[in-house]
């Protein structure tokens, strides 16, 4: 069976709340770290989420 090219990643809130989202990304087309603005329900506002490895 073929191994998938997409890798699971965790997007961790920069607000320091410990909240995170999980998603996948294609390592071949997006080798750099992912960074995006998403809603953090703990602080109830949009903050920057940065990529981290899933342990």
Swiss-Prot record:
SUPFAM superfamilies: Zn-binding ribosomal proteins. Keywords: Ribonucleoprotein, Ribosomal protein. One of its GO terms (molecular function) is structural constituent of ribosome. InterPro entries: Ribosomal_bL33, Ribosomal_bL33_CS, Ribosomal_bL33_sf, Ribosomal_zn-bd. The keyword Ribosomal protein applies. Pfam families: Ribosomal_L33 (PF00471). One of its GO terms (biological process) is translation. Coiled coil: none annotated. GO terms for cellular component: cytosolic large ribosomal subunit. HAMAP family: Ribosomal_bL33. Belongs to the bacterial ribosomal protein bL33 family. This is Large ribosomal subunit protein bL33. It comes from Proteus mirabilis (strain HI4320).
């Amino acid at each position: 069976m073929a191994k998938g090219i997409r890798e699971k990643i965790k997007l961790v809130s920069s607000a320091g709340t410990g909240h995170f989202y999980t998603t996948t990304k294609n390592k071949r087309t997006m080798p750099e770290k992912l960074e995006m603005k998403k809603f953090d329900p703990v602080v109830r506002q949009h903050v920057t989420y940065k990529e981290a490895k899933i342990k």
